[in-house]
Amino acid sequence: MKIVVTGTRGIPNVMGGVETHCEELFPRIASFGEDVTLIRRASYVNDGLTEWKGVKLVDIATPKKKSFEAIVHTFRAINKAKSLGAEVLHVHAIGPALLVPYARLLGMKVVFTHHGPDYDRDKWGMAAKMILKLGERMGCMFANEVIVISDVIKNLIARKYGRTEHVHLIYNGVPSPEICDYPEYFEELGIEKGKYILGMCRFVPEKNLHHLVEAYTSLIRNEELGMRNCKLVLAGDTDFEDEYSRGLKEMARKNGVVLTGFIKGRKLHSLLTNCRCYCLPSSHEGLPIALLEAMSYKVPVVVSDIPANLEVGLPKEDYFPCGDVKALAEKLQDVVSKPLQPVDYYMGKYYWDKIAKQVDEVYQSLRH
């Protein structure tokens, strides 16, 4: 089956939850014998690749503008998919889903994966939020098959659009952990094993990393808590440097926070292997891949109590009220004060091999 994928910036090694999802999923789909082409945004990749792990890669130039790059790229990608003879177009995220009806008019069968209500993100203005909501509507009403990554999203589209048929709950996955040390990298960062809190995500407002920095700062300033030897490491960056990301970085540097930039591979694996705990204080998520990845390393986690995080099913003591910096600080202090022990989380729903088979079954249903 000829499958063309759009709605992602690209793979491999491109920052973002949808990008991580596609990087894990589509090589597995290709290994089943499917003919998979993924269309990338040229401004995010410079590796010259035309194929990666069995997935064909096509780069299309798109203006790198936050407000309209996704829709321009999707329009061009749909036209390219038609010229490639795509039997199935797989569209990721609600912004690109705005053009699902166009793809249907061109005769393609469409699978739409809803990764979360992006219009809830703080970074979007009113006009962008309206377009994203329209994209969600178009995807849910006109796609042949809809994949949702959480029960929260499944219930949302049933309530808003009455879409209950041809809807498939298929979770995000997490790869097997790569346990490793990287002494030279730790020396470069000025950190020690087991003596740092890790925040790992994009530097955008809804991730609430400023709350994490505020909570950490309040702890290290209180000498009675004995937190001065514990560092805070923020691994990540932003696609579009803006007032928020610049302010966050400046705030972090002033308070001794370690900034790694966007990292993958051994550097990231070593940070996950050796952190004291992982923290995700966000106000918006679909199903957080970064949290699942931290859980796979059996490290303690502290996360906000938003619906997407609650759906992961962590113990009650791992959650704090979203936006409550004092409660976050108390949770971090409590975790750091306890002896470090590996935590066995239930990860059965999040195996990528299982997830890939579920997605391929959706494709096969379109043969009929």
Per-region residue spans from a language model:
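Short His-centered aromatic/hydrophobic patch
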Residues: 91-96
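Membrane-proximal helix-turn-helix segments that form the acceptor-binding/catalytic region
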Residues: 79-82, 105, 129-146
